[in-house]
Design a protein with these regions (language model features):
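Alpha-helical assembly-interface signal, strongest on the long, hydrophobic N-terminal helix that forms
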Residues: 1-72
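Short secondary-structure transition/capping segments
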Residues: 4-8, 99-106, 134-141
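Low-complexity, flexible helical/coil segments
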Residues: 6, 51, 82, 86-90, ...
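Short, functionally important structural connectors and interaction interfaces within domains
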Residues: 26, 107-108
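Generic secondary-structure boundary/loop-capping signal
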Residues: 31, 108-110, 120
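Short amphipathic secondary-structure patches
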Residues: 49-107
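Low-complexity, S/T/G/P-rich flexible repeat/linker segments used as non-globular hinges
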Residues: 112-141
Length: 141
């Protein structure tokens, strides 16, 4: 018996490689890149929320002995922290309610391979932090 379909496997791989495997590899690289950028944005947003929550309203502490966050100071600090750690990010909102600060950010990320119809993806992050009182004196007694 003589086989006439010799070389058919080579033709199969010649079609399979550019049609299936290369786009799959490009998608994998794009997904890993976006995931890394999203993790960086989340970390920067959390750091900005912590820094913003440390902006104490001194007037409220002095007049009413209440520990709350200064709204204006928190907004300025959040914008500064985000500008320093993630320059491409945009602060969508800084919400201050009493001693809690919630920051919402977004960033447009360009994809390394333009495999998908979208050339860029917008990622979002949200983080909250709370201002809490510490100890009264440095002594442990």
């Amino acid at each position: 018996m003589i086989r006439v379909d010799r070389g058919q496997v080579l033709a199969f791989y010649a079609v399979l490689l550019p049609v299936v495997l290369l786009p799959l590899a490009a998608y994998t690289v794009d997904a890993a890149f976006v995931s890394t950028q999203a993790a960086g944005l989340q970390a920067a947003t959390a750091q900005a929320a912590e820094a913003a929550a440390q902006q104490v309203d001194v007037g409220a502490v002095r007049s009413r002995s209440v520990l709350i966050v200064d709204s204006l100071g928190a907004r300025v600090m959040a914008a500064r922290e985000m500008r320093d750690s993630e320059p491409g990010a945009i602060v969508d909102s800084v919400v201050v309610v009493g001693s809690r600060v919630t920051i919402t950010t977004r960033e447009t990320v360009g994809l390394p391979f333009n495999f998908l119809p979208a050339q860029a993806i917008v990622i979002h992050a949200r983080a909250s932090a709370r201002l809490v009182g510490g100890y009264d004196s440095p002594s442990s007694r």
